[in-house]
Amino acid sequence: MGRLLVLEGIDGCGKTTQLQQLSSWLPKSGLMPDESRLVVTREPGGTALGTSLRQLLLHPPQDADPGPTAELLLYAADRAQHVDRVIQPALERGDWVLSDRFTGSTMAYQGYGRGLNRELITDLERIATRGLTPDMTVWLDIPLALSVQRRGSREEDRIEAEGLAFLERVSEGFSDMCKARDWVSVVADRPLLEVAEAIQTALLTRAAAWQR
């Protein structure tokens, strides 16, 4: 079996940039078996179906915004397809998968942010993932003010436009899960390369534990 690595965090935390850094470093790190490939993916939108769901979730037509429960179920559908068509087959081939978001984002945004029932979300996680859990999740932790500053004047999607109070609840959710789910926390309000090196060091440490 391969390995599933996940980057989590609020919008503007630098996930996309760090995903690119990690995807360049990993194949040369010596951590991956020679025969393994690296599959880089994201949620929502890691499959053809997921791409359509992403558009519906983040940029819906006028007057077609999904309600909170519908939103939760659409994210679960995206994840179920993602696990079934991309992640699980890759792991079974012995490949490594690097994903921009996974189950933690649903708990943070829909559980903490929207205030939906967290036990229900946990049950949906189990169904959508068929019990699959990441080998390592990295939470990129940044102050909310920096998140807002980094996003600047770019066009916001439907979730990003929810406002500061929503983002505060989401950030609290990520913090709680980092403690409860054995995630790795990386302070991300530093220069790009410092953050990348911190992630690499954390991964080397975790990989050493896998060998024990």
Curated annotation (Swiss-Prot):
Annotated binding of ATP, by residue: G9, I10, D11, G12, C13, G14, K15, T16
Similarity comment text for this entry: Belongs to the thymidylate kinase family.
Gene name in the database record: tmk
This enzyme's EC code(s): 2.7.4.9
Top-rank EC class of the record's enzyme: transferase
Catalytic activity: dTMP + ATP = dTDP + ADP
GO cellular component: cytosol
PROSITE patterns, sorted: THYMIDYLATE_KINASE
GO molecular function terms listed in the Swiss-Prot or TrEMBL record: ATP binding; dTMP kinase activity
Its biological purpose: Phosphorylation of dTMP to form dTDP in both de novo and salvage pathways of dTTP synthesis.
Gene3D superfamilies reported in the protein's UniProt record: P-loop containing nucleotide triphosphate hydrolases (3.40.50.300)
Identification of the protein by name: Thymidylate kinase
Any Pfam family hit: Thymidylate_kin
BP GO terms, sorted: dTDP biosynthetic process; dTTP biosynthetic process; dUDP biosynthetic process
Disulfide feature: none
CDD domains listed in its UniProt record: TMPK
Keywords: ATP-binding, Kinase, Nucleotide biosynthesis, Nucleotide-binding, Transferase
